[in-house]
Amino acid sequence: MTPPCLNCSFFPGQLSPNASTGLLSCNDSEFKEHFDLEDLNLTHEDLRLKYLGPQQVKQFLPICVTYLLIFVVGTLGNGLTCTVILRQKAMHTPTNFYLFSLAVSDLLVLLVGLPLELYEMQHNYPFQLGAGGCYFRILLLETVCLASVLNVTALSVERYVAVVHPLQAKSVMTRTHVRRMLGAIWVFAILFSLPNTSLHGLSPLYVPCRGPVPDSVTCTLVRPQFFYKLVIQTTILLFFCLPMVTISVLYLLIGLRLRRERILLQEEVKGRISAAARQASHRSIQLRDRERRQVTKMLIALVIVFGTCWVPFHADRLMWSMVSHWTDGLRLAFQSVHLASGVFLYLGSAANPVLYNLMSTRFRESFRETLGLGTRCCHRHQPRHDSHSHLRLTTVSTLCDRNSRDVPLAENRDPGCEQETDPPE
C-alpha cells in the first residue's frame, strides 16, 4: 500500500501543504527558508519535476511485473478460498468464517489498493479521482489493513481458547459468536480508520512567489504533521506491536499446552498393563504428535508471514511521519523502504491461500473439487490417519466439522472427525 503521503516523491518540510491559496508573498517569513530564486524562471513543468519528481517512477516496469504476478496469485487464491468456504457446507465452521473475512480483506487490498498504486506509480500527479476519491481510497485501504490484523489476532485468540480452554469454548466459541465478532472487527476497523482519513485531502504544489502550480494536485497530508505523527504511532502500537506480542504469547501457551498433554499421554500409556493396549495407545500418540507438529508449523508460519510482511509497511509510515528534514540519503532510503513495503504487503495478502494449500489436506482437496479436478482419493476409503491428520492446523483445524451449523469449536476435535461422512449432495 502507498504511504500516507500517496505521492512518495513529495516529502514534508519542503513547502506548506495547507498554505493560503492566493499568491504567496516573497516577503512572507514562512517561505523565506524555502525560497529559491531559480524558481522564478522555471516553467510549471520544471517546478513539478523539481518538487514532485517525475510522473512515473523509475522502477515502474519491474514493479509492475512483480505486482501483476502477486495480483494474479492473490486474487485467484483468495477468490478460490471464498468460493470454497461459501459453496461447501462442510467448510461452514467458525474458524473458516475468520478465514473468509481475512480473504475478503486481502481481496480488497489486491483489487483496490494494488491497481491504484500502479496507476499512481505510472502517473503520480495530478490526482484524478477528486476529493471524494482521495477520502474513499484512504478510508478503504486503511480499513482493510486494520481488519486483516484484527482477523489474524481474533483467529489466534479462538485457537487459544479452543486448545487451552476447551470447556469454555463449548459455550462461547459458536458460529453465532464468530459472526458477531466479525461484524465488530469491521466496524472497529472503520472507526479507527477515520482519524488518518481526516488528516488527508487534495493539495496542489505551492511555490513561494509563484503560487499554486497547475496540474500538481496530490492526495496527501493536509493537516499539521504533529497529529499525523500521533495517529501513526498509536496505530502502530495498537495494530502491530500489541497484536504481535499477543499472538506470540498465545502461540507459546498453545505449544506448552500441547507439550504438557503429550507428556501426560505418554505417562498414561506406560501405566497400562496390556501390551496390546499400550501399542494401540502408542499409535494414537504418534498420530496426535504428527498433528501437533503440523499445528506448530502452521503457527510459526503465520507469525513469520504476518510480522515479515507488516514490518516494512509500518517502517514506511513511521519514517515518513518522524523525519522533518529530508536529505538525499534519507529520500533514497525512504523510497527503498516504500517499494519494499508495497511488495511485502501485497505479498502477505497473496500468501495466506498458499499456506492453506501447502499445509491443509482438506483445503487442497476442496480447491481441487471446486475447480472440477476431483480429489485424489475419497475420505471414507483413506486410512484414518491420512484423512484427518492435517486438519488441526491453526487456521483450518475445524474443517472436519461436518453438517453442523452451531457446533462449538471445542467439539471440532480429532475424535469427531473419525466419524465424519460426506455431506449430502
From Swiss-Prot:
Any Gene Ontology CC annotation: cilium
GO terms of biological process kind: calcium-mediated signaling; chloride transport; neuropeptide signaling pathway; phospholipase C-activating G protein-coupled receptor signaling pathway; positive regulation of calcium-mediated signaling; smooth muscle contraction
InterPro entries in the cross-refs: GPCR_Rhodpsn, GPCR_Rhodpsn_7TM, NeuromedU_rcpt, NeuromedU_rcpt_1
Entry membrane topology: Multi-pass membrane protein
Protein name per its UniProtKB record: Neuromedin-U receptor 1
Origin superkingdom: Eukaryota
Transmembrane segments: 60-80, 97-117, 138-158, 182-202, 236-256, 295-315, 332-352
Annotated disulfide bonds: C134-C219
Subcellular localization: Cell membrane
Tissues in which the UniProt entry reports expression: Highly expressed in the small intestine and lung. Low expression in the central nervous system.
Reported function: Receptor for the neuromedin-U and neuromedin-S neuropeptides.
Keywords: Cell membrane, Disulfide bond, G-protein coupled receptor, Glycoprotein, Membrane, Receptor, Transducer, Transmembrane, Transmembrane helix
